[in-house]
Amino acid sequence: MKRIILTYTLAFSLLSAYAGEGGSPPLKNTDKSLLIDYVDPFIGTTNFGTTNPGAICPNGMMSVVPFNVMGSSENTYDKDARWWSTPYEYTNCFFTGYAHVNLSGVGCPELGSLLLMPTTGELNVDYKEYGSKYKDEQASPGYYSNYLTKYNVKTEVSATPRSGIARFTFPKGKSHILLNLGEGLTNESGAMLRRVSDSEVEGVKLLGTFCYNPQAVFPIYFVLRVKKNPSATGYWKKQRPMMGVEAEWDKDQGKYKLYTRYGKEIAGDDIGTYFSFDTEIGRAH
């Protein structure tokens, strides 16, 4: 029996610039009638080329790139394991989200932040546990797609000059969209989130230290909107470890704490937000 699945569309805008309602990524041209149909975005994505196959417009401020360089020993390379920095490596296999705002072909630990990840089942905000292997990669100018085997989720992303667009196709059941502000390629830390509504958050993330320049630091501002109203929303934050008696009464010490009822601003070095959905069969949005 064919399984009917539901698609959520969201728009991720940089510098608080929103380019309209989130829509579907452009259809791919299969007859090679345009010169861009001969472009292979995977060129340079391995052997220290440090390019990436993500979606970006020419001279665009937003790029949406698969982030597969952390979280698993099964990867060929890890972002912190050698003198090598890129949000994407072709031979790696473990996906922990889509990074927004990236450098391609540079090789310095900068940007590669605002990690957006779809998951299913019980909510888990630890990237080492919620990451997934993937298959069926496709990329063309302005478009990227893959299939997360852990969750049976198809992911698709595209970009406008100032915003990113993502479409996640979930199976029936509980599903989540996670925004991780604690991890990324940059060596800088610190972020703030504010919930505007059940379907929208805005915030700021500190980036910088380009090519090991510790004072080259700057903030970026963003807005994230989901098209469908979630069944639940919340934050998370990594708690400091405690010792002795203090540790006995705080079950979240040293772990990721979920904030399920707190709705005001939140800030920290390792924070994030989630949107949860109840995916139904045959219901389109």
Outline where the language-model segments fall.
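Accessory carbohydrate-recognition regions in carbohydrate-active enzymes
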Residues: G22-R283
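Intervening/peripheral non-core polypeptide segments
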Residues: M1-K2, I281-H285
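Bacterial Sec-dependent N-terminal signal peptides
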Residues: M1-P26
